[in-house]
Regions:
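Alpha-helical DNA-contacting segments of helix-turn-helix folds
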Residues: 51, 55-64
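Basic, helix-initiating cap at the start of DNA-binding domains
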Residues: 1-26, 30-42, 56-59
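Short hydrophobic/aromatic patch on the recognition helix
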Residues: 42-51
Length: 64
């Protein structure tokens, strides 16, 4: 796997893990995309590059 592909995969995993943690602690409705991005140490724009909307994180969870 190329370095960029590896970094992209790791970033997506980091966003996903941060979202799951926030959903558990705060609830889905109370969690914003901005909070997920901050917890994952990425910009809000980067979050939306990986997930077009917050619900897409849950769809990703369902596919795993």
């Amino acid at each position: 796997m190329a370095v960029r592909e590896y970094q992209k995969k790791r970033r997506r995993e980091r966003i996903f893990r941060a979202a799951m943690e926030l959903f558990r602690n705060r609830g889905f409705q109370e969690t914003t995309a901005t909070e997920i991005a901050k917890a994952a140490h990425v910009s809000r724009g980067t979050f939306f590059n990986y997930y077009p909307y917050k619900e897409a994180v849950l769809l990703d969870y369902g596919s795993q």
